[in-house]
């Protein structure tokens, strides 16, 4: 069978350096949702719950009556105003997005000559930039995956970093992230999981800097993956360039309503409570997995864990046969076939995972 007809699993048995040479588009766009089948116990997708909480469902249901009209400029501004209030920014420094990933699709409009992406991390930025013909330099951080700004080429006029980072669960200090700044360089910080981090979380979203863009997602904490809700905060000139040529009415009324609702004070309090719950569940889960002799990357601060185990690809298949989905790690640059990512879950689901691991390890 030729490479172009080979199955993804066969391709992913190659060494890490070879992964991106075999159908790179497919590998860079491999996400945890493809691991999950109906009825599976899901540790592969980093979304909390099966759907939005009742209060948010009610809010969206009320907004259904507006679907006969085009999304209004007033509603869009009100949502930007609410996001801005949450972060202490101006509404003009907020750009509403159809999911945080849409922000990555806009990065080529900033016309970088060389982009540096910090890995292991989310690979959508690499895919988008390479599709646009932008040279991409992958900076591979070795375990324990702490940021080393000296590894970034000085010539890079765009640097993209996740904080906390998917899949390592590492939270980089704010000072380290800002140390990536250079004259003529734009630093893009993917804070998709920031609202799930207990405490201040080292976010830079509230810092009004003309060379830093922060991308946020509302998908994870609020279980809105199907609605696609997110936003960017950054300098007005940078945001204007990012959305140049964007279609009119880029977000629907329900997306706009969800973004506004999820950044209001009540929702922020709910997210804070959820981050406390995640912190407790993560601590318990680490203890359970550590007792099995698994190596957990850390200190973990996100709602997922990066696990190293010999023969992780075989372990994943054995778990799959038992109706348990975990995220393979070998599609992330810098990781190999001995890594898995598992979402933080409650004790009932962790019991199921641990029982299965006791059998397959």
Regions found by a protein language model. Give the residues of each.
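N-terminal "arm"/small-domain region of PLP-dependent enzymes with the aminotransferase-like
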Residues: 1-70, 85, 155
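PLP-dependent aminotransferase class I/II
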Residues: 51-53, 74, 211-290, 294-297
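Short, conserved charged micro-motifs
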Residues: 54, 311-318, 348-353
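Short loop-beta-helix segment that forms the pyridoxal 5′-phosphate
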Residues: 71, 84-106
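Conserved PLP-anchoring active-site segment centered on the Schiff-base-forming lysine
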Residues: 108-130, 135-137
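Active-site phosphate-binding strand-loop segment of PLP-dependent enzymes
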Residues: 137, 141-196
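Conserved PLP-binding catalytic core of the aspartate aminotransferase-like
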Residues: 278-279, 289-322
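PLP-dependent enzyme catalytic core of the Aspartate aminotransferase-like
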Residues: 321-322, 333-361
């Amino acid at each position: 069978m030729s490479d172009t007809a080979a199955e993804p699993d066969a391709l992913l048995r190659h060494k890490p350096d070879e992964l991106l040479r075999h159908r790179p588009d497919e590998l860079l766009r491999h996400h945890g949702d493809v691991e999950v089948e109906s009825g599976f116990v899901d540790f592969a997708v980093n979304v909390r719950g099966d759907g939005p909480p009742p209060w948010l469902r009610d809010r969206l249901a009320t907004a259904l009556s507006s679907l006969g009209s085009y999304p209004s400029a007033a509603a869009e501004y009100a949502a930007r105003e609410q996001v801005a209030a949450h972060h202490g920014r101006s509404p003009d420094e907020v750009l509403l997005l159809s999911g945080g990933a849409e922000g990555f699709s806009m990065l080529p409009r900033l016309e970088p000559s060389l982009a540096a992406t910090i890995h292991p991390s989310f690979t959508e930025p690499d895919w988008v930039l390479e599709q646009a013909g932008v040279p991409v330099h992958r900076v591979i951080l070795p375990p324990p995956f702490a940021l080393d700004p000296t590894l970034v080429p000085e010539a890079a006029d765009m640097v993209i970093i996740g904080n906390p980072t998917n899949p390592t669960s590492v939270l980089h200090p704010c000072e380290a992230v800002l140390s990536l700044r250079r004259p003529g360089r734009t630093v893009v910080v993917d804070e998709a999981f920031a609202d799930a981090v207990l405490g201040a979380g080292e976010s830079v979203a509230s810092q009004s800097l003309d060379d830093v863009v922060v991308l946020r997602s509302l998908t994870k904490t609020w279980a809105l993956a199907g609605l696609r809700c997110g936003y960017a905060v950054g300098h007005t000139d940078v945001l204007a360039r990012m959305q140049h040529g964007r279609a009119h009415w880029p977000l629907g009324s329900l997306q706009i309503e969800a973004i506004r609702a999820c950044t209001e004070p009540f929702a922020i309090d709910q997210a804070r409570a959820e981050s406390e719950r995640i912190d407790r569940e993560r601590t318990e889960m680490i203890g359970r997995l550590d007792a099995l002799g698994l190596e957990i990357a850390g200190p973990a601060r996100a709602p997922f864990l990066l696990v190293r185990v010999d023969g992780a690809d075989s372990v994943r298949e054995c778990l799959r046969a038992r109706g348990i989905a975990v995220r393979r790690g070998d599609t992330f640059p810098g990781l190999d076939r001995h890594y898995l990512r598992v979402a933080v879950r409650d004790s009932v689901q962790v019991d199921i995972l641990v029982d299965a691991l006791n059998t397959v390890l």
